[in-house]
Amino acid sequence: MRKLHLDSLTLQLRSDLQCIKASSSSLCDQMDCMLRVLQDLKRSSPPPSPDIEKTCAVPQRRVPRRDNRISHRTSDLSEADSACCMDLPSDVSPGSCGQRGLEWDSGYSEVSGSSLRGEEDDIVEEESETRAPAVVLRRLPTPSCQRLSSGGFLNSRQGRIRPKSTSDVCLEQWRGIGLGSDSQDWTGCLLSQSRSRQPLILGDNSFADLVKQWMDLPENGDEEGRRVRDGGRWLHKPHGFLISLSGNVKRRLGNMSRLRHSDQEAVKRMSCPQLGCRPLSPYYHQSLSDIAEASTNLLNCRSRRPIICNEGAGFL
């Protein structure tokens, strides 16, 4: 059985290999046909015109120009520092040199702004060349600068106005907050111009205290209006409420005076209460019954003050 199974598998593999060989041969034939067709098309196509050759040659000539422009951007500052000495052409004036410096250096930073502007010019030129291939745009040669000692390079950049960034504007605004008549710090201005100048005192219920203090804050800063409102608040109360309030005040004042009078008339309490027993004596002169009676009197006493008995410390 195993032998028959192996024979069937080998036959199936051989048939698969033959199919793969046939498919590979057919693919090779198709590739050969495609190559022949391409060669025939290439031979039958007409030769290119000279105008097309010129348009194809334009991008190849622009590659070194772009490289030169990038190198000019990166080496602009280094050439200025080394004080390059080159003669200005007769048709170029210092004003055009200043305009050129403004064109190459308009932005927040001297390298990023010039690079971005140069890339935009390259994109515009490439689009124009793709639209009209016969026209070739060329930039005017960059005017050279004089020596730094003569002041030509520095004078060309004097008329340029650098725009302010957002951080500079914010910094000026923050500095302007504290510049007043009293010239306080901005933290002092913030604390003095706040709505509530009273100290915050929180009790057990902090949230309720916060809400109460917030509700008690005046809407306007004038204190005279607040006093008028407070006086009017008591005047608008009903007559019965005022009478009951005065009665409560009188009652409390009477209780306070009564307590003070009772304290003055009270007899000074002894440190050791009078228990109604005979004076204490040494232990061996008393009997057990007297000791038990004294202990019960001490337990039934309602005095909240400590009992200090220097003479009878041995009994207690």
Curated annotation (Swiss-Prot):
Gene Ontology MF terms: protein kinase binding; protein serine/threonine kinase inhibitor activity
Quick one: where's region Disordered? 108-130
Bias (Acidic residues) occurs at 119-128
Region annotated Inka box 2, chain positions: 289-316
The segments labelled Inka box 1 in the record are: 182-219
- Assembly and interaction partners: Interacts with pak4/pak5.
Protein name in the entry = PAK4-inhibitor inka1
Source organism:
Xenopus laevis
